[in-house]
Amino acid sequence: KGFSVLMANSLMFQRFPNHDGYDDPSFSSFYGQTLPLMKDGIPVEIVHMENLPFKQTLADVKVLIMSYSNMKPMEERYHQMLVDWVKNGGALIYCGEDIDPYQQVPEWWNKSPYAYHSPSEHLFELAGLDRKPAAGKYTVGKGKIQVIRRDPKYFALEPDGNKVFKECVYSLYKEVSGEKVELKNNFV
């Protein structure tokens, strides 16, 4: 227990099958964040971004996995809430290359007073990181941000495409909880 994937209401807005050479077949970016863990018997909970203002939303989360490859934040305030959670000891894994065409949709992150190429740049800047941090693990306050520069769809679509993802998730979980992840083929 303690693994969650961040979802936003905008998740279903990005359902165009192929645009400018970018595709996310069969909801793969979402499944890429959940199925690799579930196949190892790890229950994964969903956290709705729009529920972040409620204090209890992240109370039991040890590792929060997110990507803007398949959704976008509707409001900038959610980023400060995520950063505050990390600074207080939370562990956030961000997966993505930030290259899908929806990054350029006219929205708050690329309108005045901002000029970000993707909403993740705003998140990382609030965390005190470079706007486009390289893949790696970063200490932010008492917590950690792990950046995986790969779209999560590849964790579901490619054979062994989830190896690095699972290594990062399980390693970060052990680091923040002090517990080893128990892998199994069931949820009991």
Label each residue range with its predicted role.
Residues 56, 72-188:
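A conserved amphipathic helix/loop scaffold
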Residues 8, 49, 68-69, 97-99:
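An acidic- and aromatic-residue-enriched active-site/binding cleft used to recognize and process polar
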Residues 2-22, 26-31, 67, 72, ...:
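Carbohydrate-binding surface patches
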Residues 58-70:
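Short, well-ordered secondary-structure micro-motifs within conserved domains or adaptor modules
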Residues 36, 40, 67, 85-88:
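Generic, well-ordered alpha-helical scaffold segments in large soluble proteins
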Residues 1-61, 141:
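Aromatic-Pro/Gly-enriched surface loop or interdomain linker
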